[in-house]
């Protein structure tokens, strides 16, 4: 019987550093990577490319079931490959964001994408980045990490990121938005943002990203008995 490929799930709120951690771990272990937060945008873009009706659940389900997407991390940069093309920039447009909200509203589309995400589980292993990876998508994952940070620290990181890109931002407004999103995510009826019972909760508030990566890799290697 073929052994099931191991999965390391990295869940947590926006701004905790999940993306950076997942890319670093995928490169360090040479494992596959799943960015679940991008997958609805990728489906929306595929629908736009193929002129699929965004209001038709029946048309979207087969597209979601056979979505040709992969995520590649190289030197800390994540490439989103749809049907052989790098669409990392294209999925960040407002048109795609709006379309993603439409397709995510359909229950059968969500179910199809759940199965598609689980199909990323291939040897030698998978790093899964999201909000419900350890609780819903891969509840049997041998390594689960919930990466957290204070809302103030996450707002500060987001502010610096926006300022580096030339945007003027108000810290208090940013903090209020993050707190509102946290409250909504943690109290929603379906797949609330909570650590899995068997997850390591890693608070990155006072840690550098290098320290977070070191702690996460050490924990994963210990749990999986990796060299």
Swiss-Prot record:
Binding-site positions, ATP: 12-20
Top-rank taxon, per record: Bacteria
Catalysed reactions, semicolon-separated: CMP + ATP = CDP + ADP; dCMP + ATP = dCDP + ADP
Keywords carried by this UniProt record: ATP-binding, Cytoplasm, Kinase, Nucleotide-binding, Transferase
Listed name of the protein: Cytidylate kinase
Compartmental location: Cytoplasm
Cellular component GO terms held in the UniProt record: cytosol
GO molecular function: (d)CMP kinase activity; ATP binding; CMP kinase activity; dCMP kinase activity
HAMAP family: Cytidyl_kinase_type1 (MF_00238)
Pfam families in the record: Cytidylate_kin
Chief location category: cytoplasm
Organism from which the protein derives: Salmonella typhimurium (strain LT2 / SGSC1412 / ATCC 700720)
EC class (word): transferase
EC number: 2.7.4.25
Family to which this protein belongs: Belongs to the cytidylate kinase family. Type 1 subfamily.
SUPFAM superfamilies given in the database record: P-loop containing nucleoside triphosphate hydrolases
GO biological process terms on file: nucleobase-containing small molecule interconversion; pyrimidine nucleotide metabolic process
């Amino acid at each position: 019987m073929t052994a099931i490929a191991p999965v390391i799930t990295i869940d947590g709120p926006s701004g905790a550093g999940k993306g950076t951690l997942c890319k670093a771990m995928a490169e360090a272990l040479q494992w596959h990577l799943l960015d679940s937060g991008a997958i609805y945008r990728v489906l929306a873009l595929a629908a736009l490319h193929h002129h699929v009706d965004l209001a038709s659940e029946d048309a979207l389900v087969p597209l979601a079931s056979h979505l040709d997407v992969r995520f590649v991390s190289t030197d800390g940069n994540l490439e989103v490959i749809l049907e052989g093309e790098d669409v990392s920039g294209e999925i960040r447009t407002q048109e795609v964001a709006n379309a993603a909200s439409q397709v995510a509203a359909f229950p059968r589309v969500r179910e199809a994408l759940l199965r598609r995400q689980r199909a990323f589980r291939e040897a030698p292993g998978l790093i899964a980045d999201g909000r419900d990876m350890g609780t819903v998508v891969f509840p049997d994952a041998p390594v689960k990490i919930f990466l957290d940070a204070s809302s103030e620290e996450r707002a500060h990181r987001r502010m610096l990121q926006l300022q580096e890109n030339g945007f003027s931002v108000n810290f208090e407004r940013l903090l209020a938005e993050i707190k509102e999103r946290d409250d909504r995510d943690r109290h929603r009826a379906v797949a609330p943002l909570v650590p899995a019972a068997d997850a390591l909760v890693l608070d990155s508030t006072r840690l550098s990203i290098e320290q977070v990566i070191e702690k996460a890799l050490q924990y994963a290697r210990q749990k999986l008995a990796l060299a």
